[in-house]
Amino acid sequence: MITSEHITGLILAGGRAQRMGGIDKGLIPFHGKALIESAISRLKPQVSTILINANRSITKYSHYGYPVLMDETPDFSGPLAGFSVGLKHCKTPYLLTSPCDSPLLPTDLAEKMASELEGNHLELVFASSKENDGKIWSQPVFCLMRSDLQDSLNSFLSKGDLKIDRWFKELRSSSVLFENSQAFANVNTPEELSALEKVLS
């Protein structure tokens, strides 16, 4: 049975945040503290340890007491670059990933994903959510993967492909449905930040 002791959490804070004017999203003030702190507090009980993937503000992120890992690929290559460096430094059998700007991430994220992965002998599972209109949306940056997938990912990246869904298709993978779509709400614009703050006010 997969438990929290078998899982390392990886918080992705390495993006450009172009729609936020290029500011570092993880450090945006949110209810009196940096946005990443909400992700840390929700992820921490679900994992044995945490890694942070960031490409700037390294000193500030290091103040949280967790290893801060920079991409080893150039030019902000997206979440797969973060996955790659996270897998390289993961010392547990599984890696659970989450973006830094989703302060409502599910508190049962690891539990539900571990059950799906283990029960169906999968290599990777990712979240999906049901929206108010009934549509199912993929949430691929929220995923649980075996930590022995580094060679597979590096081989994929060596082809110059950065599309997360295409890598998933090369694996034994599946999605896990979460009914609360708001749990995956993230911050891409100032308006979305304001809306999220109102949810928690």
Feature map (PLM): residue ranges:
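Nucleotide and nucleotide-moiety/phosphate-recognizing core
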Residues: 2-161, 166-185, 190-195, 199-200
